Amino acid sequence: MVDELVLLLHALLMRHRALSIENSQLMEQLRLLVCERATLLRQVRPPSCPVPFPETFDGESSRLPEFIVQTASYMLVNENRFCNDAMKVAFLISLLTGEAEEWVVPYIEMDSPILGDYRAFLDKMKQCFGWDDDEEDEDEYEEDDY
């Protein structure tokens, strides 16, 4: 019985050693693959965006429709970057300057729920900066995510 246990222990130790060697080899392969991936990623250039980066918005009412179209178009072609309403609103906020930037500060300070609701945020912007929706605009926004 003792001899059998010694043989079993010896077999287990041999298996352990073989697995340790295999594990070391796999770790080395993983390290090489990570390095190769990094090298390949440095060589890849992301495709250029067909829609230019939107201009900033300073609160000038006549520019609000243009601003909304520019930002919506940009977010549409870069949809992987704008996966939820909070990201969309944050993007819009990053482009606000002047009076428009001053307008949004209280919403940020009170961590308003509107910061996570893209459509509600647009509606508030339209109310504040004087753009009245007609029925056609409302139907268009109901069809789109932007």
Swiss-Prot record:
Coiled-coil annotated spans: none
Keywords noted in UniProt: Nucleus
Keyword Nucleus: yes
Pfam families associated with the record: DUF4939 (PF16297)
GO biological process: cellular response to lipopolysaccharide; cellular response to muramyl dipeptide
InterPro entries the record matches: DUF4939 (IPR032549)
UniProt subcellular location: Nucleus
Assembly: Interacts with NOD2.
Sequence similarity: Belongs to the LDOC1 family.
Protein name: Protein LDOC1
Organism: Bos taurus (Bovine)
